[in-house]
C-alpha cells in the first residue's frame, strides 16, 4: 500500500477515490490535486510511478488534513463553548446547532431516548 500523509491508500482504486480516504480530502479537493499534478483522474494508484506519488504527497502536505484538521475543529468548538455563545451552548448540551427543530426530531444528535422515571 502507498502511504500519503500517514494514511494507507488503496492500491486498486482510482487516484481520486483513493485520495478521498484521507480525512479532509473530498471529491472536489481530490480532483484539484490531480489537476495540479497533471495526473489523469482514471489512473489507478498501483499504476502511478514514484515521481507522481511524490507530486501528490507534496500537494497534500500543503493542505490542512488528518490530525491538524481534527484538532482545529475541536479547538473551534471549544472556543465557542468558552465564549458562551449560543452555538457553544448547543454543542455543550448535545443539541442541533444550526436551528433545526428538537421537539420531534434530532434523535441522532440527542442520542437514544432516556426513559421517564415514575
Swiss-Prot record:
Q: Which InterPro entries match?
A: Rbsml_uS13_C (IPR027437), Ribosomal_uS13 (IPR001892), Ribosomal_uS13-like_H2TH (IPR010979), Ribosomal_uS13_bac-type (IPR019980), Ribosomal_uS13_CS (IPR018269)
Q: Which UniProt keywords apply?
A: Ribonucleoprotein, Ribosomal protein, RNA-binding, rRNA-binding, tRNA-binding
Task: Identify the domain of life.
Answer: Bacteria
Disulphides: none
Q: Where is this region: Disordered?
A: 92-118
Q: Which GO terms describe its cellular component?
A: cytosol; small ribosomal subunit
Family to which this protein belongs: Belongs to the universal ribosomal protein uS13 family.
> What task does this protein carry out?
Located at the top of the head of the 30S subunit, it contacts several helices of the 16S rRNA. In the 70S ribosome it contacts the 23S rRNA (bridge B1a) and protein L5 of the 50S subunit (bridge B1b), connecting the 2 subunits; these bridges are implicated in subunit movement. Contacts the tRNAs in the A and P-sites.
The record's annotation in HAMAP family points to:
Ribosomal_uS13 (MF_01315)
Name of protein: Small ribosomal subunit protein uS13
Instruction: State the organism named in the record.
Output: Wigglesworthia glossinidia brevipalpis
Amino acid at each position: 500500500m502507498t502511504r500519503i500523509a500517514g494514511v494507507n491508500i488503496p492500491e486498486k482504486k482510482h487516484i481520486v477515490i483513493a485520495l478521498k480516504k484521507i480525512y479532509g480530502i473530498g471529491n472536489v479537493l481530490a480532483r484539484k490535486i490531480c489537476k495540479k499534478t497533471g495526473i489523469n483522474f482514471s489512473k489507478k494508484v498501483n499504476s502511478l510511478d514514484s515521481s507522481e506519488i511524490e507530486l501528490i504527497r507534496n500537494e497534500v502536505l500543503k493542505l490542512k488534513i488528518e490530525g491538524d484538521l481534527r484538532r482545529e475543529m475541536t479547538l473551534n468548538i471549544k472556543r465557542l463553548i468558552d465564549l458562551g455563545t449560543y452555538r457553544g451552548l448547543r454543542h455543550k448540551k448535545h443539541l442541533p446547532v444550526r436551528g433545526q427543530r428538537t421537539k420531534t426530531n434530532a434523535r441522532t444528535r440527542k442520542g437514544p431516548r432516556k426513559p421517564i422515571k415514575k
